[in-house]
Each structure stands twice: as structure tokens, then as C-alpha cells.
Amino acid sequence: MDAIDIGAPTPTPLPDAPAKDFMTDAQWETLYALLDGVLPSITSTTSSVVTDKNTSILLSDTEFESLIDDSVAALPNGPARSKVKEYLEFRPSQDEKFREDCLRSLAIVPQRGQLIKVLNLLGLLLTWSTQNSGNAGSMLLTGYWTPITQQPTKVREAILKSWATSRLTALRMLSKSLAQMALKANSVYSPYFSEISGYSDVPKDWKPVDGYDYNFIQVPAGNGVHEITTDVVIVGSGCGGGVSAKNLAEAGHKVLVVDKGYYFPPSQLPMTQAAGAHYLYDAGGVYFTDSASIGIVCGGSWGGGGTVNWSVCFRLQDYVREEWAAKGLPLFTSSDFDDSMDRVWDFIGASKDAIRQNPRNQAVLDGIQKLGWKGGVVEQNTGGKEHYCGQCHLGCGSGEKRGPSVAWLPAAGDAGAEFMEGFAVDRVLFAEDGVTAVGVEGKWTSRDENGGVHAHENTRVQRRVVIKAKKVIISGGSMWSPVILAKSGIKNPNVGKHLHLHPVNFVSGVFGNRDMSSWEGGIITSYVDEFENLDGKGHGVKLEPTSNIPYATYSVQSWRNGVDAKLLAMKYRHIGTFISLTRDRDTGRVYPDPRKGTPRIDYNTSDFDREHTIEGLIALAKICYVSGATEIRPHLQHLEPFVPSDGGKRQAEHQPGKDPEFTDPDFAAWLRELRAADNKPPTALWMSAHQMGSCRMSASEDTGVVDMSGRVWGAKNLYVADASVFPSASGVNPMVTAMALADWISRGVASELDG
């Protein structure tokens, strides 16, 4: 593939903003007033820039000048003093782009039939505070008779802080949700964020390559149902679908891969944060569970999760393979599964030979060396190339990441497979016996006349399509595969159950004397597995760096107050963020929304699992400590960051092999607070990027959804090939395991077709 030097990715326009009429103008103004409390304008009492002093947090001239001086002094090579002053005085809630992002966030809340608690409580609060000036409702929820819109910003901030510590779960969640909304909008659209933080949507030395010419099937306009016939229809173009397509096409079978998402070539990647969240992920960037306790990110474009994942290649560990085999699934300790993993490993070019560590990953490696913990460098699916790219979360312009859209699907296409983007499958079709799958049915939506996908669907060609096939493979991932099966009439009560999420909590280290620029370089090229077996049964945590794209990490920082939130943006180039990734023992479920037919998720991290997560946070804090962090910030409410009181003297004197919990009494006292901290959902902040097990493989129909060949129990010619068939959580990033299972399942399907 030849490089194309055009300077920056081709912009991908967003659709028009949705209508805002689900809230009144008065309610929107009250919302903006609350967001003022999250990210306020900060100025001096004598400032001539801010004329309405009620709209800012006011400091004395001395305090304000000192805040600016301290910020500049603490950030070597940071923004100029005049820019810091301008940024502090800026009021984000009045910016139109900031408001638009808040609108988009609220408009795509998944549970629109029963709005999540944020919007419910806002409606309750806003009705009381806007219809009854000086009423009991305002007093009850805010502690003030005067409505929020009439309060100075300092009071708005105080209200949010009181909600964050309220005994009422709903108010604590409201505070958390408002903070996340404001921080996300600020990181995506602030006119100052990039200049203050150093972040750029365009990677250094960006040079895209030519993408594969997919030649997607186009359906003519018409009123009737359009029919297509093939040997195998594969629903989903992600890690499972891509592997399956290659194997079956190379075996000589007619294959059609369909996906509800669209393909974006390297010339459009990485996208901006706003466009990437909208086009490359499901649900506008994040699903929320029914309790809003955990945010779930999963790929939603052509290539699925493989388009946006972070290149990490872990083989499934032996103790997990043995656990799965003990469930009556001997495949997992067989040489056949070894062969499948080896084929995947070789094809994706999993290697660590050319990795160049960025400062954030190096901090992990330095930390485990100083602490004497197990861990190391993790292979990448980059074919032995350096791939110093920290923005694959928003798509990879270099074409070096050998995921489905770059490697597997092109190989399938070269072997004769066909492809169809923009096709949302509603259900599997069955023969008259109700058992034998004979195809799928759904709705196809074209691109617009200019080849874009931002125009309203009603302005594009839409048509019902039936695809008739001898075999149907569902590879929609753990969110969509069970939903498609359920909507197809599969009655097995296990469909959608046994969902594992690898729930994570975060720790950020501020390395004030170092330019981390953590959005540059490999996202996860290091790991710690010292704590992966905390219960003696294979449940624990893996510690890893995480993506430092601002909307993904700045928005999930713990909100303490308005000044701290603004200063965080200035510290961003010095921040490295890490995750405690939990191999969850306990599970949830996925089910179709009764109105929209989209996935709904019922999951709460259990007390058993979250205790392991806390142990991971403690370990991450120790890594940050010994790696020289000047501030350690677990993303937990009510916990103050650790800032060395001695200027880092004890950190500098730390001896390798020593546990700093026993050498620094201040740090030990803070760790006790961390160990006692509340990370209980729904008010604690949890995220998931790995979904597994919702169509799990089992030895009998009573305990799972598919048999050891991937065939759906009680059905014929219907298979599932993706991470949803995992018998439990993998405990490692699941890409390689999902691909290996798809390799096994699709080769079995090919053998059946060959007779």
C-alpha cells in the first residue's frame, strides 16, 4: 500500500444535531447553570473581561494571579501565561459547540422509553425550580430557596458538591453524570483544550495508506423486498466475522458479509473525537447499563471492534483453558485450539519486536521492575511494525493494525467473498420446521449521493432485504448476537445471560516534570499480571495503560470542584491513565429493548469483583508512586489525590524491591483511604471495553446457547462466532481468543458444507 501525503484525515461530517424539544428552553438554561458549576469561569474580583460576576467563581486579585503563576510554573513547556488567564476566564456553558455536544449526549441516551436517572432527575428538578421561584422543591434538592439559574456560580458548584456526597444515590449519580457530560464536551469542543493540553486530533507525521476496495453491494431503490442468495451469510464484520469470512471464502464457498456499520478508509482515520464516537462505536460512543452504573464501548463500524481496538495480543491463558475444558468443552485443552490460535497469531503478525515504548507504558515497565512484580511487554497485531500510534481508538490511518478491515476481510474478498455495509439484520429466517436457518432479513440503507453517511436516512435509499443462505453465522458481538437471536424467536433462556464485561476502574498519574503526551505511541504495550489470581480460582485483575484520547479519559476523571476540573486540562500533557481490568466472576445479561429492538444491558459489578478492582487500583497507585508521579488520582469520588508532602524526596529514595506502602507513612495512610474507598456501583465510575459470554458455549442446552462447534442449540445451520460464545470471562484482552474460536467454528462450517 502506497502512502498518500495529504496532511490530515479527510473530515467526516456529523449528522445535523437532533431536536432539543425533549426539554424546554427554561430547562436547558437550568442545565447550563448546573454545568457552570462543573466547569466555571474563574476570574478576579476586579476583572474587566467578565462583566457579570455572578457567572464566575471570583478570586481576589492575589489569589487569581497566584493560581496563574502556580499553573505556569508547574507545567514546563506549557501554555503562555496570557493563554492560561484567558482559558480560566472562559465560560464553557455559553459556547455553542459545548451546548451541541451536551444535546447530542442527552439525545442518544439508550433508554429513551424510560430515561436514565440523569434526565429523570433533571426533569423533576427543572420543573420545580423553573415553575416555582423560591419553592420547597428547590430547597429540598439544592438547599436553597432561590432557583439555580438565579444563583451565583459558586453556589452552583456547592450544590453539585453536596449532591456528590448526598445520602441519596440518585443525587450522587446526577452529580457524576453532569460532571462527565461537561468534561466530555469540554475535551471535544473547547476552543482552548488542544492549545492548553497539547492534544491534536491529527497524529504527528500522519500519512495514510490506500484502503482495500471493498466494492460493496448496492441495492436499487424499490418498494418490494430485495433478495440475495449465497452459501454463507455472516452477520458482523468484526473479529469473529472477519476470520470466518476468510476461512469460508478460501474454502471455495460463496460468502456474503453484512454489517449495519459503514466502512471508513485510512484517509478518514483517525477521526475527530466527536466523529469517531458517532461513527466508529455503537450507541454514539457508549452504552449505559439499565442502572447507568457502567459505560460500555463496542465497535459499530465496518471491522467492528477490530477497527478501534488497541492492537493488544494475548493468548488465552492455560488456567482459563483448563477451566473451560472442565465445563465439558475439551476443545480448549486440545491441539486443535492450539492450531487455531497459532493460525490467528501468525496471520495478524503478533509481535513485540519493533515496539517503541511511550512514557506511559514505560512507567508501567519501570514500576514492575522496581516493585518486583510479574508483567512485561505485550505483542501487537502490527506485523512487526513499530506502529507508534496512540489514536487507534478513533481508527488507524496507517493501515498497520492487522484487524478485520485491513487483513481478514481483504483476504476474504480476494478469495471471492462479497460485502454489504449499512445492512441492519432484524432476524434470522427459518424453514417451515422452525429449526433450520435459511437466511436473514433486515433493512439496508445506502450512503448519500456524495458517498457520505451523515445525511438523514430518509434522504437515502432504504430497502428491505432478504438474504437466503445454506448457513448463517452470527458474529455481531456480545451486545448484538443475543439480541438478534432473541428477535429471531430462539427461546433458549440462556440467550443474553452470562454476560461478562471485564469492568474497569481508573487511576491517573500526573507526572509534572515529564511531558507524557500519552495520546502518542502505542496504547497498551505493557501489562502487569501479578494480581490476576486473587481468589485462587483465576479471578483477579490485569493492570494496563489505557487510551488517553481526551474524551475517553478526561471525561471520566473524578470531579472535585470547578478549579480542579479546569486545571486538569492544563495538566493533560503530563497525565498517564491506567486501568484495573477485572476478570469478573459474576455476570449480567443483554436483552432487546422492547420498543427499539436495540441492546439493553442489566449488569452491576458485584461486591466480590469490585474488591479485586480496588486491589488493582492500589497496585496502580504504587506503580505511579515509584515511577515518579507528582500526583496520583484514582477516579473515585470523595478521595483526594495523593500529592507527596515532601516534594517527592521519599519517592526519589525508593529502593527497588521495596513496597512503598511500608517506606512512606504518608503514602501508606493515603492507601488506607483508597482501600476503604467506595467503588460500589452505580455511583462509582465503571467502564467496559470487553463484552463476552452472552451466547456462551456449553456442553448442554441447559447451560448455554451454542455447542462446541458453535451451532446454536436446538437449531440447524445457525452458528455464533464471536466473543459472545466465551464460556466465561477470558481475563485478557479477548481479540485473539475470539479470532481463534471463529477460526475453529468457521472451519467446522466449511467441513459441513463440503459434506
PLM ranges: what are they?
Residues A8-A185:
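Acidic/polar surface patches and capping/hinge elements
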Residues H253, K260-Y319, R360-Q369:
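N-terminal FAD cofactor-binding segment of flavoenzymes
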Residues S177-A221, L331-E432, A437, E441, ...:
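Conserved redox-cofactor binding core of oxidoreductases
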Residues L140-Y144, I148-K176, N186, W302, ...:
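Rossmann-like flavin
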Residues S709-A729:
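Short FAD-binding loop at a beta-strand-to-alpha-helix junction that anchors the flavin cofactor
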Residues N223-V257:
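N-terminal Rossmann-like FAD-binding beta1-loop-alpha1 element of flavoenzymes
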Residues N247-A274, G295, S301, D414, ...:
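Glycine-rich loop(s) and the adjacent beta-strand/alpha-helix scaffold that form part
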Residues N492-C624, E631, P641-S645, S688-G693, ...:
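FAD cofactor-binding and catalytic pocket of flavoenzymes
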